[in-house]
Each structure stands twice: as structure tokens, then as C-alpha cells.
Amino acid sequence: MSRHGPQSATSAQALGAGSALVRPHEMVDEIGHAGSKSALARLNEAMAEIKALSMAPLLQRAIDAIRADDHKTATEWALKALEQDDQSGFAWYTLGIAREKAGDFASSISAYESALRLLPDHAEVANDLGRLAFRMGMLEQAEKLFLHFLARHPGHVEAVNNLTCAVRAQQRYDEAIEILRPVLLRQPDSAMLWNTMASIVAEQGDYATAKLFFQEAVQLDPGFFKARYNLGNCLLMLGETQAALDACDEALKGVRAEDERQMMHMARSTMLAGLGRLGEAWDEYECRLHPRFAEITYFVMKGPRWAPGMDVKGKTLMVIGEQGLGDEILFANPLGELIEDLGPDGRLVIAVEKRLVDLFQRGFPQATVCSHITGAIGVRPARTVPEEVDISDVDLWTPMASLLRAYRRSVEDFPANPTGVAADPARVEVWRQRLAALPGRKVGILWKSNITKDARHRYFAGFDAWAPVLSQPGVTFVNLQYGDCAEELARAKAQFGVDIWQPPGVDLKQDLDEVAALCCAVDLVVGFSNATFNIAASAGAPSWLITIPGSWPRLGLSDRYAWYPQVRVFGLDRFGDWGPVMGRVADAVGAFAAEVAAEA
């Protein structure tokens, strides 16, 4: 980009904002498109006002290029117009549309802001800027921009829908429903509004009702492919995995925007995994590396990237961890076999989050383990290794999850005794001695994720659902939950009469070596899949997993967990109905405690 508008607080924040609001299994919003027919029509009307200016033909060519989806050419003509008059709001607006459609959000948001400053009465600019802010996860700014547009266009259906999406994404569900309800009552034939209402209901965990609303949207508009995709995600959460995949495949037939297509490919990969079609799933999962995938992480590495089928014997191969802590541990499942394939003359270099380095080094002593670092390219995260790490002899490199394409193409490919991370034996013994002073079986528990910004809470039982588990006699419960859990610990004491033992002197989020040792020292770990659960299970601790329908890491299995063979699975029968499964967990914990009592 050769020109940039003045940077405001909004554009400055964009440079550090998350890329996208929507994740796989999350619902996608219909908030309209920059450069829509109505927006381009208004631009054409504006051309009449500036037709006497020399830039008019340049802008017309830019608009024609946008219509033809030629965003590069549109950008070039808009920049030529700005070279003649950099105070033309319409030229900045045209540039903003072109850059947004090209996926260059940082430049786009700057251009839109310049347009809004120069065209304060052209409310369509505020609407487009709001949509872009929404796509980048800048929800408060998006809400204000949609309100600005509605002040000029009260009752505008699309703008009301957009505002609802912004409010809902901030988890203000009741407020979102109240904004949307009167408009939906006036226009009950609007598929867009039914899709948004369904998304609100789904985020609150009522997938059965959401399914009906998404079906209504699809029935009203069979060509509304985003609603069809959302229906697929809803079906997945209800355990209807094949129907979910069918809906996703239908949606892909009609979606043109590349970022939306890649998002759907990501969801499709997890649906395939949930059906046990692992080879297809991992091949599809490569979409996470597509440049138009909204949550891409760039890997900044020199040399060729490894691909399935390459002969690695005698090579030096670098594997880079990706996504969250739990993912880095989960996706490490094939590393043991990779080391065998490299042979005695080969070398494996593993780059992981710095808190995991010692755990990986103990688990894979033949490898060289270092930390990775994450910066940014534009608004996208970029991962590499520190300069002090010598990788001059690396022959090949790969993101860690890509190894699944070669080593885990079926459930049968998962070994009975996989190599994983390893706790410090000396620290395990220290914790065992401390725990020996406590009565009964020692059961570590995990009940939530620390991530709340994307409504992930609905994947975890509320703390009250743990009451039957915590009431089991003959057990000392040990807190393994990282993050702020003081309220839950106090409630356990006040409401259930249970003192959950808090490990002294340990930061359960940062001191992962101690966490691993503690997990291996207790008799059992029980909880949901988060970073700590993956550490415990990978290190070989006896572990019980509570999981929801549609959870792709189950790989279509109901009675076992292929990643960690010792894990016992307790699956939800129906999304949101935590009572039965927590009852089964409680009975199992009681039986587990009774075994020791009987032996004594």
C-alpha cells in the first residue's frame, strides 16, 4: 500500500486485534458485505457528483473491478484516484472496500476511517467500518458504528441485525434478543433474522431450539449458505455428525468468499474427525495454514517444509507446536514414531511454548527441545524460534499437527503406549509424600476453561453440577484448576461441605512442571479437556475425561480416547444435560474410593 489514512484509536487497536470472531463449531453471522450491491449503487450515484473531476474515470474503473472481484486492480485504480486528490472520501471508501475484499484488514480499516472523516453524512461508510471491526473482533467499536448508522437510518433491518450480532458476541444475550425480537416480529420471513436469533440461542447452549430456527432460515432461503453451515455446526453439537457434514458440504457449494470457505473447511475437518475419517480430516485440517483462513498463524522458517511421504531418515527435522498449550501436547502424539523414522543419524528439534520445554525434553530425550516465540505479520500471529537457537542444520520443518497426516490416518494408527511428556520423578515423589498425609483417595479435579470470550463456557458443566461428585466419601479432592477459582472453592465449602485441597506454593497456570508432577502424584485426575488435563494424560496419569457430543478429539469413539489410551471417557448424552453424566462420574468416583477401603 502506498498511501495510508490517518491512524485513529480504532485502526491502532486493529493492529493488535484477534483476526476473527468465529471458530470451528461456532456460528457464523450474516452481517452483510462491504461492496454490496446497495453500497456500490450509492457509489455510482456519488460518481454523478464528481463526474466533472479528473478522478471520476479512475474511480469508475475501481468500482467496475470490485464488481468483477478483481481486488488488486480495484486497489490500483483507487490509489491512482487518491494521487490526484487525497481528500476524496469516495476514493478512500472505494479503497477500503477493495482492501477488505482482498483480506487486507489493517489497510482497509484505515481507509474506511479516512472516508468516514471526510464523509460524515455518508452513513454507509460507518456500516462497512462496523462490519470490518466486527470481523476483527473489535466488538465495542463495531457496536458504536452500527449505532451511528442506525441514527441516520432508524429501523434499517440489516443494521439492526448487525447491531444484534455485535451485542450477542459480547455475551449480552438478553439485550441482543430484545434488539432483534421486534424486527423479527415485523419481518418473520427474513432468513437473516432467523439465523441471528438461532445463533443467540445456540450460544446459550440450547441447540435443540437453535436447530429449529436455523432450519427456518434455510427453508425461507435455501440459498442462504451461512445458515446452512450454522445448521451443520448445531447438528454437530447435538451429536448428529453425519448430518452436520452433509450440511457443511452443501454450504460450501454456494460460498464464494475465500475466508468463509476456509472457515467452513476447518469445521469440516473436525466433522470428519468426529466420524473417524481421519485421513480426510487431517488433509482438510491443512486449511488452517491457508493465507485467507481468518485465524492463520504464519510460520517464519527457512528451508523446505516437510510433507507426508518424504524420506526423513538421517535428516534434521524441526517440529513447531501450534495453537494452545493443550493442542501442543495432543498433537505431539506421533513424535515417538517420527524419532524412529529419523534414525540414529537424524535429529528432531521440537519448538514448544516455553512452559512446556522441560516436560517435552524429559519425554523425548533424544530430541532437542526449545521454545518458540510469536510475533505478528500485520494483524496475524507469526511464529518462529529465538535467534539464539541454532537451526542452521535443519533440513525440513513442519507445524506439529501436520504430522497427523502421515502417522494417524486411522484410529488403528494410534499406539497402545504412546510417548508423551514426562514429569520430574523427584517432584512426583515430593507431592506423593505431601498427599500421603491427607485421608482417602486423592482425586484432582478440573472444571472449566480459562477462555471465556467466545462463549466456551457452554462446553463445561457449571460448578453446581459437581455436587454429586464432591459428595463422595473416602476422597480428598485436589484443586488442579488454573485461573481464578476462589469463588468455586468457597462455594464447595459453604454449599457442599467439602474442603478442596489447594496445593501450596504452586501457580497452576505457570508452573507446569509442578502441575505435571502433582497430576502424576494424585490417584486420579477427573475433568474436562483443558491444558492441564492434556498434561496429566500425556504424562501417563490415570485420567477421566468428561466430554460433550460432537467433540472431535474423540475421533468417533465412545468407549476410549485414542490419544491417551489410559483415559476413561464420560460422554454427555445430550448437550447441556449435565445431570446424568455427572451422576455417572460421581458413582465411578465412589466406586474408585471404595476399592481402597475394601483393600484396607
Regions inferred by a protein language model and the residue ranges of each:
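Alpha-helical solenoid repeat scaffolds of the TPR/TPR-like class and their adjacent stem/linker regions
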Residues: 1-524, 532-533, 537-600
